[in-house]
């Protein structure tokens, strides 16, 4: 299983270089699961929609769409998806993929991350 995590610092679809990175992860590397933090208002590009499923969750308390979290996963192996809220209000996604639980969370910077992780 190939898993990748990436803080794209904004929607990859709005930047040609970031879009090339995303396409590389999904086509060349053929990652089974790609987790993106700060993905903006992400929509899965049409050329990948037949094979992949995606989930986008807004962070609670965020004042813009930049801090959204996204998981892109191969459709054939996704068993379930759960949404969690950390102690600081940040959202997390848990994906059961082929029997493995995979989590993504965009933690607060600094010491806030300890509370985010501990309270899940």
Task: Describe the function of each predicted region.
Residues 1-49:
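N-terminal, active-site-proximal structural segment of metallo-dependent hydrolase catalytic domains
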Residues 8-15, 81-83, 111-113:
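Short, flexible loop segments at the rims of nucleotide/cofactor-binding pockets, characterized by
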Residues 10, 103-120:
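Active-site-proximal segments of metal-dependent phosphoesterases and phosphodiesterases across multiple
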């Amino acid at each position: 299983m190939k898993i990748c995590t990436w803080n794209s610092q904004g929607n990859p679809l709005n930047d040609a270089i970031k879009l090339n990175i995303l396409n590389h992860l999904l086509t060349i590397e053929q990652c089974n699961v790609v987790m993106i933090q700060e993905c903006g208002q992400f929509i899965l590009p049409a050329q990948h929609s037949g094979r992949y499923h995606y989930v986008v969750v807004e962070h609670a308390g965020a004042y813009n769409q930049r801090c959204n979290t996204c998981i892109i996963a191969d459709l054939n192996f996704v068993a379930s998806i759960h949404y969690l809220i950390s102690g600081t209000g940040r959202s997390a996604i848990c994906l059961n993929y082929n029997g493995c639980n995979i989590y993504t969370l965009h933690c607060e910077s600094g010491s806030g991350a300890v509370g985010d992780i501990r309270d899940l």
